[in-house]
Amino acid sequence: MFNKKTDHPRGSKKLIGAWTWYDWANSVYSLVISSAIFPIYYSQYIFAQTNSVIIFNLEINKDTLISSVSGFSFLIIAFLSPLLSGIADYTGNKKIFMKFFVYMGSISCLGLYWFELETIEISLVFYVLALIGYWGSLVYYNSYLTDITYPKQTNMVSARGFAMGYIGSVSLLLVNLIMINYYESFGFTSEINAMKLSFAIVGVWWLGFSQYSFYHLPKGNKGVKIPKNIIWNGFRELKKVYKVIRSSKRFTRFLLAFFVFSFSLQTVLYIASYFGVSEIEWGSPSEQTSGLIISILLIQLVAICLLYTSPSPRDLRKS
């Protein structure tokens, strides 16, 4: 893949553009797989004839299964993120870790094409790896923001990244909606095949468009060798951060509150679509598919409008 040590100065348009472009690349995962199409495929087609499955000699309800697997994935992320962040800070090379999660997540999205009830164990492994890849890459992606921008640019660049993510994900979801509704025109025999292809497209989109970001984002300290005790050094970096946090009770309370709020919110967002598929009477399966996807599309469009109509910090200061 393309790679180079960036020559772009901090705050440059090229560097900022490369950073925001990754939002365009990876946001299709959160919309197409987490929110829109995969929940329909999982509830409406994978578990069309049954509400439970046998895994390791245990009968598990389909809703309990996906909720538990998603929660388990977030626990892994909660453990790995601070440790890997400490390792990245120690080595001074965020890009290599970001690449690892991007490749793992995008390739796992390709694996979701073969998500079937008969192979539910390996299918769920792809689901977990895709979710970890998505959130793991965001740890390093977000940490780049203060490296490539000046403080006065941070809010504007962050908002631009969100906007790019919304526009990119909505664009692909529209393509997928057309492909699913008119599957015969695209050579598919059923909606199911069109849905499965949409998962693979997400993987290709994510992996392909992220290369532009990798090409221009700073690589870090090229000459730093990775020591044998790098894991221990990662824990040492965490210990330093922990001491800083413990020095302020207010900061500690804020982080605990944010942790509970953030993970609770993410859990609700991930399960909301499965609730919509199971509990809302949409009519026929095709009407259910179109209705849920269009509903999520409208939510995304509202978010885009809010991003472009909300006052900037500069406007607020003037008022």
Locations of regions flagged by a protein language model:
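Glycine-rich segments within core transmembrane alpha-helices of 12-TM secondary carriers
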Residues: 159-176
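Juxtamembrane intracellular "pre-TM" segments in multi-pass secondary transporters
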Residues: 4-12, 220-254
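C-terminal ends and interior cores of transmembrane alpha-helices
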Residues: 103-117
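Conserved small/polar residues in nucleotide/adenosyl-binding loops
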Residues: 308-313
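Transmembrane alpha-helices of Major Facilitator/SLC transporters
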Residues: 292-307
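Short amphipathic helix-loop junctions that connect adjacent transmembrane helices
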Residues: 36-60, 270-288
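Pair of pore-lining "gating" transmembrane helices in MFS-fold secondary transporters
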Residues: 13-45, 251-267
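Hydrophobic core of transmembrane alpha-helices in multi-pass small-molecule transporters
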Residues: 121-136
